[in-house]
Amino acid sequence: MHDAAALHVVEVLLVIGMAAWDARPLLSGEMARRFPRVFWTAAGLIIAIAVAALLAAIYAPALLHLMIVVAVALTSAAAWLGRVNYGRSRGLPPGSLSLQASIDALFDRSFYRNSAAWLGPVFKTLQFYQPTVCVVGLDRAHTLLRTYEDALGPSVQGFSRAIPQGFLRYMSIETHGVYGPMFRRALSSRVVSHHAAAMALAASRVLGDAARKADRAGGVLPDPYLDEMIDEAFLAVLFGLSPDDPDLPQLKSAYAPIARLHISSRPTPAVLAALAGVRQVLTARCARWRALPDAEVPICALSEFAKIDAGMPDDTCLDNLVFIYRISTMNVAGLLRWVLAHLAGHPDWISRLRAELDAETPSDGPALADRIVMETLRLSQAEYLYRRLRNDIGFEGYVLPKGWLVRLCIWESHRASDNFPEPDRFDPDRFLRDQPRTAYMPFGGDRHACNGVSLSNVICRVFLEELTRSYTWSVVGADAVEREFRHWSHWRPSRRMRLRLEPRRDAFSAAGQPARSQA
């Protein structure tokens, strides 16, 4: 009897030990700090398994034996899949499909770069609990996108299900062939540049607010001021809305549930109702504009659709505009945070930009503010593209299986020394020279590439020029980087980053006001 009890104790410990071993990547202190819900769910599962094993040992020893078999099978399968050479006989790329690899990618910004150096430019890993082929090198990415366009489908986020025919970047090739050209025209540089002066006024106003509230020793958190200026710019360019537009409160009220939706989540009935409410506001605006002379209709993306086609904008156009507003405001704010962080470490570029603005002499090639934004996109903001394989394909000597994700590693590819000498150095002047299409791809590289290039660049340029022209400024606390949300989100500078700014007494803002009056 004592021997049987001792055996049961060993069996219980074996079940608990294997469960804890399999879940160990989820039980680290880093997981507890960054993702407490995941940590405590994993810990709770281990406790539940321990309790079940103890009860089985007391009341159902046969069930305990079954638990051991299942635990051994799961642990063995995880170890087998985690081998770097797993699938070599089937032609799969090298790399581990272990949970540990997925967690490493979550916490280590250099994971993909280091993996490519070790395994080669095409390798496999596990992401979102799904097997993924990673491709480093934009020449390879372009070849893959061009050669296997029909075999590469979108990796669709949940919010796209709320939109008839889907979000622009997730549309089928045929559907995108209809809507893509319309959005390119609706978000053209002509439409965006019409709002540049208003953007400068908005930047001047929010920076004045920041300067009044800044503690000269510690500065202010830049996020609220970036968000306000960017929000105003997107509302104007997308919908023709100014801060005093009578439609704005109604649109904001209807939009509130959409603002709370995480883009990976399926839309709830409340979100669908909110989308219908926003659509109603925008449709009413379009109806009023049709009764106006062309000269009185605001120039914006919404009004451009009716010029393209009398039957537009339809629900697909309207819903896409709403979610472009939802997603892109956050992305542009992230880009501007990175611009500030990079310049914080390279104040000589701030001095150069101020000298260029004060002299009012055009650069040879893109303006310095534009080059700073382009270099920031290369070094930090542009990170990845995802596609999903519809069919098995052969690429670079490997088999890429149907159903797997493909991650095109943009951040790592932008740091290739064969395209960018000293690739880790911040050097906006490298964009005085045209970069080959296969070397620089911050907004995507196929027919689904982002249409908001002009809008993003103009917002960032206007803000940066207004800040530098009118203020003496610096940034502190920007050294650390962290995740914005989860595995699929962008990295960002530390949330502790603060902006210090004081008005330049001899400067005038883009709005034509003395900078001193803003403080």
Give the positions of each predicted feature:
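N-terminal targeting/anchor module and adjacent flexible "hinge" preceding the catalytic domain
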Residues: H2-P131, G365, A507-A519
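Cytochrome P450 catalytic-domain helical core, especially the substrate-recognition surface
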Residues: A19-D22, P93-F107, P131, V156-W289, ...
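Cytochrome P450 I-helix active-site segment
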Residues: L92-G95, H342-E383, P401-W404
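Conserved cytochrome P450 K-helix E-x-x-R motif and the immediately C-terminal K′/meander segment
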Residues: A101-G120, E360-E396
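Conserved cytochrome P450 catalytic core segment spanning the I/J/K helices
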Residues: A274-L335
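Cytochrome P450 catalytic-core helices
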Residues: T329-E356, V453-S470
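Conserved cytochrome P450 K-helix/beta-meander segment immediately N-terminal to the heme-binding cysteine loop
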Residues: L408-D434
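Cytochrome P450 heme-thiolate "Cys pocket" and heme-binding signature region
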Residues: F431-V476, V481-R495
